[in-house]
Amino acid sequence: MTATAPTDGSTDTGLLRPHAEQLYAAELAELAGADDRPRPPSWRLSPWAVLTYLLGGELASGFTVSPKYVGPRRLVEVAVATLATDRALLLLGVPGTGKTWLSEHLAAAISGDSTLVVQGTSGTAEEAIRYGWNYARLLAEGPSPAALVQSPVLTAMRDGKVARVEELTRIPSDVQDSLIAILSEKALPVPELGTEVQAVRGFNVVATANNRDRGVNELSSALRRRFNTVVLPLPASPEEELAIVTRRVADLGVALRLPELPPALDEIRRVVTVFRELREGMTADGRTKLKSPSGTMSTAEAISVVTNGIVLAAHFGDGVLRPSDVAAGIVGTVVQDPVSDVACWTEYLEAVARERPGWADFYRACREISR
């Protein structure tokens, strides 16, 4: 795993977490130059080019576009096609399935701007979706366009861009419903100014929500009807998940300037195997049923465990990723509940890890951490 320079079409910006349109500016520029297909109004790229940007491919010039999302092609096609209509898009899935990652790259490819984001929380107010006021100017001048503070959604409406609403089901239900008029009428009344803002062609909304959040602030049927829903699955196979983890770890290594380590595919494969077996409640060979922990054991968490292990190996180890470097991260991810998860993890260690050939070092490292 190298951390010296980008190995794909990404651009080194020097930023800790550059936006997608900054990091992949070179790829977006190459795609725009090679794209001669019809583009929907206000789109930077055609749907074909957006799909190529997301899934990767080789252009006629020989330029290679790196894949941003690994998953069923048809789901991505449906997502892109939805945004070419007047229907909003809801990306639904368990934590760690890449919903936010995909929404960011969709906005970057379509609008060249992934920053028009409403981050949903239990404290999100209606102003975050509609508009607010600069109260100093409001008191001094009264309601005026200059005193109006645009929300990301309002900015997207005026500019014909894609707005993102993250964690939609965490937003209070009455605030969620402020989206209904925007999505159905494509207009936002501003009664204080006696006017309304009508959306420019190209405006749309991508929202994300976790399956496990359903019931916290359930979407109203009226709001749900305004969305086309695409359910993002967990990686279908161990090899697919391994490819995702390996690639994202390499990308993070470049972004964080982590020290260069020798390839550690076997150790990453072991982390992926542990996560998949605990998540699915069954060993990979189908012979042993397991208790699943209370956590999600997501791909995103596996990426975090491996990345943290690389830092431990580089700064406090011998420069090689070993079981002892990932053990603490795995235990911390599995054991969320001090009672049920401890029993689940102990069962896995004794029934699976202890008996599996080649896992003795991993078993000892995890037992040491679990004491």
Residue ranges and their predicted role:
Residues 2-257:
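AAA+ P-loop NTPase catalytic core and its hallmark functional loops
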Residues 46, 125, 149, 164, ...:
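A diffuse structural propensity rather than consistent per-protein peaks
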Residues 49-50, 152, 240, 244, ...:
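Exposed alpha-helical structural elements
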Residues 73, 249-323:
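Conserved AAA+ ATPase small/helical "lid" subdomain
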Residues 86, 113, 140, 186, ...:
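Amphipathic alpha-helical interaction segments
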Residues 226, 244, 308-312, 329:
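A general alpha-helix detector
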Residues 314-371:
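C-terminal engagement/docking regions of AAA+ P-loop ATPases
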